[in-house]
Amino acid sequence: MDGIRRILVAVKEPAAKTLPAVRKAAELAKAFGAELVLFQSIALPLYLEGNVSYMNGGLADAERCTRDACERSLEAIACKLRRKGIEVCVSTQFDYPIYEAVIREATRLKVDLIVAEQHHGHHAASLLHLVDWELLRLSPIPVLLVKDPRAYRRPKVLAAVDPDHTYAKPVWLDREILNAGQEIARALHGSLHAVHAYVPIPALAFPTGAISEEDVETIHTRCREKANKKLKRALRDAEIRSSVAHVIGRHPADAIAEVASQIHSSLVVMGAISRSGFKRLLIGNTAERVLDRLSCDVLVIKPAHLVKKVPQKRRGAAHARLRLHPLIV
């Protein structure tokens, strides 16, 4: 991320009492002096009565009425934000699935950041909702997933880096993560923390009696020192001068969640790569474990050239004909 000039926020329900994603996006837009786009994808099918003809304008009228209603709802939100000095525009599109629609509109408008509210109601509480997961997986643009409705108050931003470049992550991805974390922390008058997780060598890796407990402890100490040096080098390469470093000898999912909880982080910035097949299963499982265990917001940054491209053409409105039958008593 090289500055934030335009932010798209995916609005789920404009009439909702609280709009956490809009609130957070507005905070960032104000802090960065960025333009804010309120976007709603109309993904539900239009139901037409049985006597409405597709040929006599009934379909076009239904689409226009639906779209006008959505735009009025978004404009009501936009008016309040404009009074706070934020530049806001609204956009609605008949398109689906929702995650593809958001990515298409964000790409068309050349935004620098997508903000989306976490979906709830999944049948398994331990699994990330499909819409959220696919948006994070497919978007070439950084995505901020809002999980905590509370406003940012001098937030502690935690940047999760991987100097070991596990799973062939690009070398520059850590720099992007750290720079994004620093930009946001600075803009919101917060502080930056960085965490690097390394997997310590288990004692069971050595044959019984082949090595003393003191030697095992020495090996663990060296592993930690090596990991600490790598993190400091990553911070130096990214020209990060003010941050708090955390080096944890645990699985990344556990380490990130642990540090985020300890420091009461408001936002975790992490990287991810998209893969297919078995690699996707392995990498996705790690990423999903991290995302599910965090109660704070998460900003996911990915190498755009490694992301599967979403088709540019919109799918348009979905239609269904509603047949009205006479009531027989």
Question: What is the predicted function of each stretch?
Answer:
Residues 116-134, 267-293:
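Glycine-rich, Arg-bearing micro-motifs that act as flexible, cationic patches
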Residues 115-118, 142-148, 298-302:
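Short beta-strand elements of ligand-binding domains
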Residues 1-3, 17, 64, 76-114, ...:
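Structural beta-alpha unit
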Residues 130-151:
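Short, structured interface segments
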Residues 57-72, 214-229:
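A short acidic, glycine-rich active-site loop
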Residues 2-58, 156-213, 217, 236, ...:
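Small/aliphatic-rich secondary-structure junction motif
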Residues 37-39, 89-93, 144, 193-195, ...:
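General small-molecule cofactor/ligand-binding pocket signal
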